[in-house]
């Protein structure tokens, strides 16, 4: 049997203020086609900031 295609991809979440990649997570492209934008804690800024999705380069 052929393996099923994986619909999830690994992404980085980058802080919009300090531009550092603080989090790595997975996303299902079929269920969530738009780019993620989450409010997460940035340990470098020591506050909650908006983190935007970046693709992981392989």
Curated annotation (Swiss-Prot):
| Name the record gives this protein | Large ribosomal subunit protein bL33
Concerning PROSITE patterns, the annotation shows: RIBOSOMAL_L33 (PS00582)
Show the SUPFAM superfamilies listed in the entry.
Zn-binding ribosomal proteins
Show the HAMAP family listed in the entry.
Ribosomal_bL33
According to the entry, what is the taxonomic lineage of the organism?
Bacteria, Pseudomonadati, Spirochaetota, Spirochaetia, Brachyspirales
For this entry, list what GO says about its biological process: translation
Q: Which gene encodes it?
A: rpmG
Keyword vocabulary terms for this entry: Ribonucleoprotein, Ribosomal protein
Gene Ontology CC entries for this record:
cytoplasm; ribonucleoprotein complex; ribosome
The record, for InterPro entries, names: Ribosomal_bL33, Ribosomal_bL33_CS, Ribosomal_bL33_sf, Ribosomal_zn-bd
Q: Name one GO molecular function term.
A: structural constituent of ribosome
Say which family it is in.
Answer: Belongs to the bacterial ribosomal protein bL33 family.
């Amino acid at each position: 049997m052929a393996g099923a295609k994986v619909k999830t991809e690994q992404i980085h979440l980058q802080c919009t203020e300090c531009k550092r990649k603080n989090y790595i997570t997975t996303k299902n492209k079929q269920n969530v086609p738009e780019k993620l934008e989450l409010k997460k804690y940035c340990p470098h800024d020591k506050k909650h900031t908006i983190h935007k999705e970046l693709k992981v380069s392989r």
